[in-house]
Amino acid sequence: MTVLSDRDIKRALEEGDIVVKPLEEEYLEEALGPASLDLRLGNEFVVFKTLHKPCIDPTVDAGENTERIVIDEDEEFVINPGELVLAVTHEWIEINAPDITGVLHGRSSLGRLGIQAHVEAGYVDPGWRGRLTLELVNFNPMPVKLRPGMRVVQIVFHRLSSPAERTYAESSGKYHGDERPSPSKMHLDFCRG
């Protein structure tokens, strides 16, 4: 696998191999790094309710343990110490080329505030279409304010050694087409008898 440079990313955007919406020209100049593209925080969050249960069971729909919060673009969202919050990118991403994949990395400026931008879901398969769910965790001993539109992650695009035989879109991925932050759908992996 090779990493796409800024030139390669621009070309892939022009040719429709990668789609990022919205992507204003002036923002592209600010967000495009030598080998990555910064993505912004959306305005929708999912928080976990404190329930009087002994644990979370991955075989059960996690959505019942969550609450969805939508804020205005000019509001702020406070993430407390030790809190896990699901959020969504402002941008809609499509990876249309079967030989391109993406990997999310938290921005170091956010990490230096104690915020981890994604816990595990940092891989974006060929054929992905949707907004990316972020798993934000605050490791700072202080609450941290987050604002919609702030750059929170960068996506690094890689070219595969050969095109994927079956893309994420063709494999009926559980999160394909997401527009909102999605709680775990792991319960769908378990067979019920």
UniProtKB/Swiss-Prot annotation:
Enzyme Commission number, as recorded: 3.5.4.30
Active site: 135
GO molecular function, one term: nucleotide binding
Catalytic activity: dCTP + 2 H2O = dUMP + NH4(+) + diphosphate
Entry keywords, A to Z: Hydrolase, Nucleotide metabolism, Nucleotide-binding
InterPro entries: dCTP_deaminase, dUTPase-like_sf, dUTPase_trimeric
Pfam families linked: DCD
Nucleotide-binding keyword on record: yes
Pathway recorded for this protein: Pyrimidine metabolism; dUMP biosynthesis; dUMP from dCTP: step 1/1
Complex and partners: Homotrimer.
Described function: Bifunctional enzyme that catalyzes both the deamination of dCTP to dUTP and the hydrolysis of dUTP to dUMP without releasing the toxic dUTP intermediate.
Name of the protein in its database record: dCTP deaminase, dUMP-forming
